[in-house]
């Protein structure tokens, strides 16, 4: 069940016509994150497929697509904070800024008849006070989360039909 959206959390859902294991496999691969990004910020990824809480990988970023902060190219470390195989994966991002921001991205997967109900969420309720006062959240809009789910659906479906 989708939690109601708050001013500090966005959730969107989409049914993807693939098994939860196929969707989860895609989300566990750092390169999969780059493939499905609708924001245009994720440029590449380095790291192994994640297998549990505490695993990390590097994402190469460029905020030019958002046209908000001229940071140029930079890297962030993604740390997995929730990992329940074929059910949920979530992570936080750490970059050069301090204090660390503390926003969380994640996916909940629920098997439905012949498919997977995927909930994508973006939660900034636990960010540090300095970031709350900065007024820059949410970085990613509800529309961007919806678009990412569309790309995920297309990507997982394409992967399943070509394997």
For each of these PLM feature ranges, what is it?
Residues 18, 63-65, 124-126:
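Beta-strand elements of well-folded, non-transmembrane domains
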Residues 17-21, 49-51, 81-88, 108-117:
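A short, structured loop/turn motif at beta-sheet edges
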Residues 45-94, 150, 154-163:
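Glycine-rich portal/gate segments that line the openings of hydrophobic small-molecule binding cavities
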Residues 117, 121-163:
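A conserved amphipathic terminal alpha-helix motif
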Residues 12-14, 75-82, 93-95, 103-111:
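Hydrophobic/aromatic beta-strand elements that line small-molecule binding cavities or substrate pockets
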Residues 4-6, 51, 70-74, 97-101, ...:
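A generic structural micro-feature
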Residues 1-53:
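Hydrophobic ligand-binding cavity/cleft-lining segments
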Residues 7-13, 56, 75, 88, ...:
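Intrinsic-disorder/low-complexity, polar/charged segments enriched in Ser/Thr/Lys/Arg/Asp/Glu/Gln
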